């Protein structure tokens, strides 16, 4: 395509949101008009399904649940007055709690104000809050925000050690809808133990963000925690950033949460339009479908040219992959759908994997996230008339052109600046794009059976470990690995048995291994003490 035709294509397919100042450019996706025409009937269906979802239809049939994250930024959309009131009341509670903490009306026993917050959660209870925290971080936040997002003991120690000297002025926000998520429960118990060891009253520092009547809600009530803020059962983890899950840590940090909600609402209105070319989320879904032939055949590379948006790709990994990565479609047919997502930031990635993107296997499409405003501070020129930001913009434009020369497809999403409103809009844009794409490929975007299978396997492993320890405790002589597996009634899981005892031995849990580590089948196991 010559330069004049390419310029015309850019103008023909450019979307611009006047209120938000956001552009979506899909002109470098190499579809033609015939492809768009073929897909239009699918979009008619997708738009109708999205309307039904917003109206309160059961959009998650596997769990028989409504899907209501869009109501969070416009409570007038809620299908019942009770739900509308619940949304409004929850937001008011979040704002009041944060205001009381900032003003010192809610304070620690030994100081006039809290200084830090540890947010404990995993998956959607952490990825969104971390992305927003980094994207909108201010130099002097109302409270310093830290995250425990795994059950890694060393990682937990790292966070707790960092705030050790300020633990007496630290809030702990535990985020879990059920209260039974092992990683989150473990993080909470580890934090609770650290407070206890320092003679601090944990409940006077503890906040729960959880579902009504959950295990965590019961603990918070029984122990007298500072606050319990609700998670709604009609909001899934990966679409929960604009619920209490994301708004509580953001508000405590001092981020303008009403602006985030306003940005999301404005984008929701734009992505509700039943016209492909004037709906930015539909343009993204169209591009994803074209790139992967509706079967996820190409990976989605997310490349934000802004340090503050670096975690956006990690956030999108869950939103896209957990929503779309499904074995079966809504008709119960095996389809193995999904889109793999990865990325970091530009121009850093130009010195990492962009070499392969330009000259290697063309198994991807790329999304550039561009931010027009360089900085808030005084402009500095690294060369006469040239700033660091000019270089950043030049690297983005140059990489986009270099990829196009090699027929590598790309999308560009442009923000005027990184503000609370823009971040809220960006989240809403991709939430809607995922929902529309899910309709195009006929999958349930709002359940995660694969995650549940992994949780069950982990629970089974812990049960097997307890059984192994009990067997060793009742056995006076060392046991061969094979005999131990037989006694545990797990001969088909002998490798798991071996790895359990190896882990226990490495952590000095009383288990000792005898034999050649390079020949696991020769090892003998015993329990000392």
Curated annotation (Swiss-Prot):
The keyword Amino-acid biosynthesis does not apply. It catalyses: alpha-D-glucose 6-phosphate = beta-D-fructose 6-phosphate. The active site is at 322 (proton donor), 351, 455. It comes from the Bacteria. It is found in: Cytoplasm. One of its GO terms (cellular component) is cytosol. HAMAP family: G6P_isomerase. Catalyzes the reversible isomerization of glucose-6-phosphate to fructose-6-phosphate. NCBIfam families: PRK14096.1 (NF010696). This is Glucose-6-phosphate isomerase. The gene is pgi.
């Amino acid at each position: 395509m010559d330069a004049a035709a390419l310029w015309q294509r850019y103008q023909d397919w450019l979307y611009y949101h006047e209120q938000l100042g956001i552009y979506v450019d899909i002109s470098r996706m190499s579809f033609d008009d015939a492809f768009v025409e073929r897909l239009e009937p699918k979009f008619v269906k997708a738009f109708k399904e999205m309307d039904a979802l917003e109206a309160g239809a059961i959009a998650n049939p596997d769990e028989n649940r409504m899907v209501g994250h869009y109501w969070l930024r416009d409570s007038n959309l809620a299908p019942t007055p009770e739900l509308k009131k619940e949304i409004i009341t929850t937001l008011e509670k979040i704002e009041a709690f944060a205001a009381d903490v900032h003003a010192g009306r809610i304070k620690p026993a030994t100081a006039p104000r809290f200084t830090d917050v540890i947010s404990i959660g995993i998956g959607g209870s952490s990825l969104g809050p971390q992305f927003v925290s980094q994207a909108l971080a201010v130099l002097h936040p109302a409270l310093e925000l830290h995250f425990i997002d795994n059950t890694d003991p060393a990682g937990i120690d790292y966070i707790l050690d960092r705030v050790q000297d300020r633990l007496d002025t630290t809030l702990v926000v535990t985020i879990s809808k059920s209260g039974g998520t092992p990683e989150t429960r473990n993080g909470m118990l580890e934090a609770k133990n650290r407070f206890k060891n320092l003679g601090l009253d944990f409940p006077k520092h503890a906040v729960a963000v959880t579902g009504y009547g959950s295990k965590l809600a019961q603990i918070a009530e029984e122990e007298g925690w500072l606050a319990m803020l609700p998670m709604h059962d009609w909001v899934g983890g990966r679409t929960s950033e604009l619920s209490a899950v994301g708004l509580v840590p953001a508000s405590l940090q001092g981020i303008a949460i009403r602006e985030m909600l306003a940005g999301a609402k404005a984008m929701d209105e734009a992505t509700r339009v039943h016209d492909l070319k004037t709906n930015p989320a539909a343009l993204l879904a169209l591009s994803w479908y074209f790139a992967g032939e509706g079967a996820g055949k190409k990976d989605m590379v997310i490349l934000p040219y802004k340090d503050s948006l670096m975690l956006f790709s990690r956030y999108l990994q869950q939103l896209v992959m957990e929503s779309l990565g499904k074995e079966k479609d809504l008709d119960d047919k095996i389809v193995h759908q999904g889109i793999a997502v990865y990325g970091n930031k530009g121009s850093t990635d130009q010195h990492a994997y962009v070499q392969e993107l330009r000259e290697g296997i063309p198994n991807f499409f790329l999304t550039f996230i561009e931010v027009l405003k360089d900085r808030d501070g005084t402009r500095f020129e690294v060369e006469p008339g040239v700033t660091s930001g000019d270089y950043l913009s030049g690297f983005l434009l140059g990489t986009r052109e270099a990829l196009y020369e090699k027929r590598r497809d790309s999308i560009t999403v442009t923000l005027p600046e990184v503000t609370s409103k823009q971040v809220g809009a960006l989240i809403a844009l991709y939430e809607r794009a995922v929902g529309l794409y899910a309709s195009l490929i006929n999958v349930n975007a709002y359940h995660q059976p694969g995650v549940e299978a992994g949780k069950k396997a982990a629970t089974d492993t812990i049960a097997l470990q307890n059984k192994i320890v009990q067997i060793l405790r009742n056995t006076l002589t060392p046991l061969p690995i094979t005999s131990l597996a037989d006694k545990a009634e797990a001969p088909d899981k002998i490798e798991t048995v071996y790895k359990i005892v190896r882990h226990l031995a490495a952590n000095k849990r009383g288990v000792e291994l005898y034999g050649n580590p390079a020949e696991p089948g020769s090892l003998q196991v015993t329990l000392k003490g």
